Amino acid sequence: MFGMSHDAYLLLDALVTIIGLIVLITRFKVHPFIALIIAAGFLGLTSGMPVEKIVKSFQDGFGGVLGFVGVILALGTMLGKLMADSGGADQIARTLIRAFGKERVHWSMMLAAFLVGIPLFFEIGFILLIPLVFIVARRSGVSLIKIGIPLLAGLSAVHGLVPPHPGPLLAIGVFGADIGKTILYGLIVALPTAAIAGPLFGALVSRYIPGTPSAELVEQIAHEPETQDLPSFGVTLATVLLPVFLMLLKTFADVAFPDGHAFRAWMDMIGHPISALLLALLVALYTFGYARGFDSKKILRLLDQSLAPTAAIVMIIGAGGGFKQMLVASGVGDVIGHLAVNAQISPILLAWLVAAVIRIATGSATVATITGAGIVVPVIDLIPGVNRELLVLATGAGSLILSHVNDAGFWLVKQYFNMSVSETFKTWTAMETILSVVGLVFILLLSLVL
């Protein structure tokens, strides 16, 4: 078409579609949910897909993603809400601060975010934990940026690299990776990466941009928990990490027991992300609810409140899944896969690059993960011996790069930390880029020994 080969046309079509998606979201302020649907429809029509297949492909992608991630998001959000309102998140922060001391308080904030952020989306984790940044800064006298950047790094690293976060879980489903191995490798990569991008970079940049919180905002959100009867550190940690433990146990059972063994069959069910998070939520109803004196009405109200803010996130994720499926069904993914094989590009590097481009284009780490995985997955069949778990991590690392003005997280950080756009680029955007690049380096190093 237009004097081009079919493959070249498909690549150009995909490029034009993604540019159009950027323009719709950034220039015309179209909601990402609507913009993704329009982009998916445009790609389907212009790529030559049969009309009846266009809607079906989008529907399959939308439903396939939400049938899994929608449940994960709801359960994780409920768990996070109970943890925050019971004072569990505050207990983790207080305990780590006592353990690390004032001089190393920024390290404790990274670990607190790392632990608390496991069941939460970045934006939700940010809203739940930002009061702790203000409280700790006030108590310790340490710079807001020196404390805040490590917390943001911990949340972002978990968001992009560690299941049961929805982003990595989506990529696990697309690539057919093992969840237990991905958790293990994700932790190996995420901890040192967050340490470099968080406490180390935060200590450096805070010398030049210390951060001055809005007095009005501090007064509004930096209050102590309503109850001083906080759950213990051990109980909080056990509750939050229960789903991770169950998923790791499933992987152990898959390795240690043969197919058809009763224990393995049970662990396959119990260690499934949905089952694991459901069990953790049921435990949290007691540890973060009834044991703290909350009655059934209050718990029900908290759970209802937790679901309302996730509606937009769920719809955007679903539309991202539909767009991803359109890229696959139109043949764009196969074209890129064959190009990667012919150019002899490392699949890990390709996964990182594709996710990075989509992240910069759309501003959404989750959309970048979904779409990037869908584009790169054909490479698995073309290049034998590819480590699927590292592809998941590479896609997640790429999805974190260069957060800028088309990312809601950029404005969230700017407003809460009372920074100018320039300061936000020098702190938040730089931190996200360090996370992405350093994460890739660790993934490539890990690939040498796996």
Swiss-Prot record:
The chain crosses the membrane at residues 6-26, 30-50, 60-80, 116-136, 142-162, 183-203, 233-253, 269-289, 312-332, 338-358, 366-386, 430-450. Pfam families: GntP_permease. GO terms for cellular component: plasma membrane. Its main location: membrane. Pathway: Carbohydrate acid metabolism; D-gluconate degradation. GO terms for molecular function: gluconate transmembrane transporter activity. GO terms for biological process: D-gluconate metabolic process; gluconate transmembrane transport. Belongs to the GntP permease family. This is Gluconate permease. The gene is gnuT.
